[in-house]
Design a protein with these regions (language model features):
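Core domains of carbohydrate- and sulfate-ester-processing enzymes
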Residues: 128-178
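Active-site-proximal helices and loops of the catalytic beta/alpha 8
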Residues: 11-14, 18-29, 44-50, 54, ...
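Alpha-helical scaffold elements lining the catalytic groove of polysaccharide deacetylases
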Residues: 187-199
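Boundary/entry segment of secreted carbohydrate-active catalytic domains
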Residues: 18-40, 180-184
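Classical eukaryotic N-terminal signal peptides for Sec-dependent ER targeting/secretion
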Residues: 1-9
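Short glycine/proline-rich turn/loop motifs
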Residues: 171-188, 206-207, 321-324
Length: 514
């Protein structure tokens, strides 16, 4: 019995450690460089992410995937593995290793999007139409490069007529049947667990800091626990001995289904999809929502416990209307609202925060649905992903949006670092859509999302002095390229924000003091 208790405590310790993102140098926020090439991510870590205080990068799935030509090379083909070879349109294994090393060397962690619930779609055919030529047969459920055979899939367990998930009210179906026709791995099999763990461990040994685990709702927590338990500790070249991989699990839980996020809390952090969905309705002022209602933002809004949450305004799915949140999600297509919503997230202490970095595509709406939501990254005619060019004004070209480079978002990533560990404090609101709050005595932010001007004197909790607003500009030598905010010896400051300003919010922090 005593040994059992010790073993249970050890397992609990392992999973508790999997909630830690292992960020370095006081950095806090990660960015999802969606569909970027490994060579571009390596360069971005060195030239921009590290100097700007970003903590890490979520990368697109690095495994080999099926090539889909109809529609032409969609983004979602990356979520249909055909082998665990580290070869994708983002680059080969050598380029992946180079990126991981170069980012780690400047203190930027790499988190891998791990697709382990399934292989490609059942209708994927047979042949070598994988990104790097690996042969597979979706018809016969054979993936010899790994190898998986028909014995390694869940078809015998699924009890629906189609073999697909038909009813999200049935937890067995959601976990044992095919998600949109994708061949569902039998993760209760020790052999399958071993192959998945081998794939994750190869990446851990290369130096990644952890994983965003795709489609966790569709896997049994016990199976995931068994796989995570086989993961190696992080590479001691860059991480302290005994560090466990950071795990954040994609579970879409907006309520109303039998499977809940809570079932996965003990295994690592979980994506809080309610966060971006609610923040979107608040900033859009839909359904009578007001910014003033966010005084209790976080657990007070029915979100998961803070220590379990990975938060984001939008992600690669729901910015296209997939996943969760619907039309309320605020994306780069609404830049003014998006900057405000991301700033609110980065200023607020709840959760580990992730910033989205997107690519543009030609939207084509028919009856409210984007017919082009499948479109892949900017690419050449042969399907090869284009590099990310950096313009002279530090924005990106060729269809890459690079929200993480927008001044307002980049400077709020720094704000989050500066105020890290400080309590939410000095709340003010006008009972409508003007609010302000601080983080201890290290930072203060003011929002005006009303259709009229804000003109108010507030207690910032900050030491007296002149501060540079990091939204309209930033410190430049001894000066400031944006608004100057004067804080008196009593901590009070006067704020004026016109509802017609380019950005209707202001933020100051300890390191923006002149």
């Amino acid at each position: 019995m005593h040994l059992f208790i010790l073993a249970a405590a050890a397992l609990l310790g392992l999973s508790a450690a999997q909630h830690n993102p292992h960020t370095k140098h006081g950095r806090t926020a990660m960015v999802h460089l969606f569909e970027w090439r490994w060579a571009d991510i390596a360069a971005e870590c060195e030239r921009f992410l590290a100097p700007s205080g970003y903590a890490g990068v979520q990368i697109s799935p690095p495994h080999e995937n099926i090539v889909i030509n109809s529609p032409w090379r969609p983004w979602w083909e990356r979520y249909q593995p055909t082998s665990y070879n580290l070869c994708s349109r983002s680059g080969n294994e050598h380029e992946l290793r180079d990126m991981i090393s170069r980012c780690n060397n400047v203190g930027v962690n790499i988190y891998v999007d791990a697709v382990v619930n399934h292989m490609c779609g059942a209708s994927g055919g047979e042949g070598s139409h994988s990104v790097c030529g690996s042969w597979f047969s979706a018809n016969r459920k054979e993936f010899p490069t790994i190898p998986f055979t028909h014995w390694d899939f869940n078809d015998h367990k699924c009890r629906t007529g189609s073999g697909n998930i038909e009813n999200y009210g049935d937890a067995d179906q959601v976990r044992d049947c095919r998600l949109v026709g994708l061949l569902d791995l039998a993760m209760e099999k020790d052999y399958v667990r071993g192959k998945v763990a081998d794939y994750l461990n190869k990446l851990i040994d290369m130096g990644v800091a952890g994983f965003r685990v795709d489609a966790c709702k569709h896997m049994w927590p016990g199976d995931l626990s068994a796989v995570y338990g086989r993961m190696h500790n992080l590479n001691t070249t860059w991480f302290s001995g005994g560090s466990r991989p950071f795990v954040f699990q994609e579970v879409i839980d907006l309520g109303g289904e039998p499977i809940t996020s809570r079932e996965y809390f003990h295994l690592g952090r979980v994506t809080e999809f309610k966060y971006g969905a609610k923040l979107g309705t608040i900033f859009r002022k839909w359904n009578g929502e007001k910014l003033s209602y966010t005084k209790s933002w976080g657990e007070g809004w029915g979100f998961m416990p803070e220590g379990n949450a990975l938060v984001f305004v939008d992600n690669h799915d729901n910015q296209r209307g997939h996943g969760a949140g619907g039309a309320s999600i605020v994306t780069f297509w609404d830049p003014k609202l998006h900057k405000m919503a991301v700033a609110y997230m980065l200023a607020h202490p709840y959760g580990v925060a992730r910033v989205m970095s997107s690519f543009r595509w030609d939207r084509h709406f028919v009856n409210g649905k984007d017919q082009n939501d499948w479109m892949g990254p900017p690419s050449h005619g042969n399907g090869v992903t284009k590099p990310v060019p950096i313009n002279s004004d530090q924005t990106c070209g060729d269809g890459w949006v690079c929200e993480h480079r927008w001044r307002q978002i980049k400077n709020m990533a720094v704000f989050r670092n500066v105020v890290n560990g400080q309590p939410h404090a000095n709340w003010w609101d006008n009972q409508s859509n003007q609010v302000a709050f601080g983080r201890g005595n290290r930072g203060f932010i003011v929002f005006n999302n009303d259709d009229w001007n804000l003109d108010v004197t507030l207690n910032t909790g900050m030491p007296g002095g002149a501060y540079c607003d990091v939204i309209s500009g930033q410190k430049d030598g001894g000066g400031c390229t944006g608004k100057l905010i004067q804080v008196g010896g009593d901590g009070r400051a006067h704020f004026k924000i016109s509802n017609r300003d380019e950005d209707t919010f202001v933020a100051i922090h300890a390191e923006s003091k002149l």
